Amino acid sequence: MASTGEIWLQWFSCCFQQQRSPSRRPHQRLRIDRSMIGNPTNFVHTGHIGSADVELSANRLNAISTQMQSKGGYETNSIHSLHAC
C-alpha cells in the first residue's frame, strides 16, 4: 500500500526534481519570477484533487491515480533522490 506522500509524489512529480550536485549550497533556492513562467502548453484538465482527498482510503486514491493516468500525459518513473523546488 502506497503512503500518502508517495501518492502526492506520483501525482505532482512535476513539482519535484532530482537532487543537484552536492557542491550547491543546501539552502540556496532558485528564485522564480513572472518572466520565467509561461502559458500552459497542451493542457488537458483530467480531474480535480481537493484538500479533503488526502483523507480517502488507499484503494480510492489508487483508483483516482489510475483514472488520471488513463487520460494520458502521466509517466511513471523511479526517482530516488528528490527535493521540492
UniProtKB/Swiss-Prot annotation:
Q: Which residues carry this modification: Phosphoserine?
A: 78, 81
Q: What InterPro entries does its record include?
A: CRIB_dom, CRIB_dom_sf, SPEC
Lipidation positions, renumbered (S-palmitoyl cysteine): 14-15
Gene Ontology biological process terms, A to Z: regulation of cell shape; regulation of Rho protein signal transduction; regulation of signal transduction
Major localization class? cytoplasm
GO cellular component, alphabetical, reads: cytoplasm; cytoskeleton; plasma membrane
Membrane topology qualifier: Lipid-anchor
State where the protein is found. Cytoplasm, Cytoskeleton; Cell membrane
Which residues belong to any copy of the CRIB domain?
A: 37-50
Task: Give the GO molecular function terms.
Answer: signaling adaptor activity; small GTPase binding
Q: Which Pfam families match?
A: PBD
- Keywords per UniProt: Cell membrane, Cell shape, Cytoplasm, Cytoskeleton, Lipoprotein, Membrane, Palmitate, Phosphoprotein
Q: What family does the database annotate?
A: Belongs to the CDC42SE/SPEC family.
Write out the function statement from the record.
Probably involved in the organization of the actin cytoskeleton by acting downstream of CDC42, inducing actin filament assembly.
Q: What is this protein called?
A: CDC42 small effector protein homolog
Naturally occurring in which organism (per UniProt): Drosophila melanogaster
